[in-house]
């Protein structure tokens, strides 16, 4: 029996995180160690996206969110950004058939209108073409940052207050969450970051308040199903207390 199958059997399906978020990091360093250009690392990372998406859907995860391109990534060399946009367009178009086969719904969050028009149109078409799927929602965070998300939420709330649609004293945690780009999904129970870096890099700042954080030294292009299962098993050995004591959590 392969390691991934052994690990999958150990997972408690009753305590499975419903939402996993992943910071896919290390593509450039992975490529550099092999004497290749950074774009080669991004191209090689597509297989990791396929494996993790399939593995998540297979075991029953309902939401998978991947940090694909941050607002800060626009500052990278033009050749790399152009290559990433081209890769995004090609991959999304190719993967629609596979997503439909696995009943995976595609979603996207971020300042999507900042994407090149061709990329935006292809993304919207893929979202439409997979909208009927119900097994799992795969969300790509594109031109996204946590601060951008909070800013756009604050701007929209301020506008609604000014127009009399929202009372200031009605603004609580749930209300703020409803204005974020992730309004239609639960907060992640588990955040995974690859490449050995141990920070959240402006990703889902509000939504990660109570998430468990899992860091692995593996670069994203090397991340496979077994690695995802190890992250989930690690999470299942932790106790989420939300500010309470262990005794209170156990009593509940």
Feature map (PLM): residue ranges:
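Flexible, compositionally biased loop and terminal segments
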Residues: 1-252
């Amino acid at each position: 029996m392969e390691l991934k199958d052994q690990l999958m059997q150990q997972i408690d399906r009753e305590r499975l995180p419903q939402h996993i978020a992943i910071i896919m990091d290390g593509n450039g360093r992975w490529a550099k160690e092999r004497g290749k250009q950074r774009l080669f690392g991004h191209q090689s990372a597509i297989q990791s996206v396929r494996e993790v998406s399939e593995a998540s859907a297979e075991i029953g995860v309902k939401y998978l969110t991947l940090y694909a391109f941050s607002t800060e990534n626009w500052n990278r060399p033009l050749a790399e950004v152009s290559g990433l946009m081209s890769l995004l367009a090609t991959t999304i178009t190719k993967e629609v058939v596979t997503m439909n086969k696995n009943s995976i719904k595609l979603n996207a969050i971020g300042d999507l209108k900042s994407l090149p028009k061709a990329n935006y149109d292809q993304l919207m078409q893929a979202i439409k073409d997979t909208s009927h799927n119900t097994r799992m929602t795969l969300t790509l965070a594109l031109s996204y940052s946590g601060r951008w998300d909070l800013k756009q939420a604050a701007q929209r709330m301020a506008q609604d207050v000014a127009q009399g649609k929202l009372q200031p004293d009605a603004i609580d945690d749930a209300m703020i969450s409803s204005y974020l780009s992730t309004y239609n999904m639960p907060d992640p129970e588990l955040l995974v970051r690859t490449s050995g870096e141990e920070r959240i890099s402006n990703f889902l700042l509000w939504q990660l308040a109570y998430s468990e954080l899992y860091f692995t030294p593996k670069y994203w292009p090397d991340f496979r199903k077994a690695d995802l299962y190890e992250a989930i098993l690690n999470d299942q050995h932790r106790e989420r207390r939300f500010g309470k004591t262990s005794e209170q959590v156990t009593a509940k």
